[in-house]
Amino acid sequence: MAASAGGRAGGSAGHSGGVQPEPITATPPPLPGRPVLRQSWRDLTFLHWRVEADVVTPLLPAGTRPDVHDGTSWVGLVPFRMVDAGAARGPGIPWLGSFPETNVRLYSVDEQGRRAVVFRTLEAARLPFVLGSRAALALPYTWARMRVTEVDGVVTYSSRRRWPGPRDATTRVVVRPGEPLAPGYALADFLTARWALHTRAFGRTLHLPNTHEPWPLRTAELLELDDHLLAACGLPGVATRPPDSVLFSRGVRTTFGTPADARAPRPGTGRATGA
């Protein structure tokens, strides 16, 4: 199965209501608050499909709405290797902080206009990391048996969920990374230049900012896809068609800032809205 890397300069994101979303930038804004976590993301593949915004809306946390590019929202399947996760001011945690991971993610805007991702699942191969992340931020981490291999320029990811179910939440992705992607691809920036996540935790919608260097993106050819994760995340039928965008990156080193209530105003605005 082959697919392209995604369009160059599509239409700008459109929104039917709410505060105008912040501009999309390939470089990060200043990290608000103090840094709390640091981790490296390596050998990532980004598979993305168009989905109608009304399909995404019920899957997002309160106080957010679907982010839209070229008339639709998007869902991403992103397998990669987590490396040296740990506290921002200390070394990465040996063994525990390095493992394969696969995310299913959506694209959101909050009532302050901040763009982010929303994770439907984060499949990870380290049970203590899964349990800690669920307890600390109610992130939807799940324990999975996962492998990432690279042979003769072909990268293979395979994952099977272990806990909590369903056990048939599996995925297998095989790609061949291509040439470096030149700057200026509007869709690539929309899908990857995300400087926060939104999550629902302890009765609130949280905004968790992050920062890292610009993504070193490459084109990629999708050689094989057998996915059941998207359906398990409430998106049946999406993975039965080829993705609309396929990208690859050798990775970045990222730092997360302090989570805050998504209703809180951005610095300097003095404005908060209900969620």
What name fits each language-model region?
Residues 1-15:
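Compositionally biased, low-complexity flexible segments
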Residues 17, 27-32, 90-94, 98-100, ...:
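Active-site-adjacent core segments of small-molecule enzymes
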Residues 17-88, 238-275:
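Hydrophobic, proline/glycine-rich low-complexity stretches
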Residues 72-124:
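Extended, compositionally biased
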Residues 103-275:
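Internal, well-folded beta-alpha domain core
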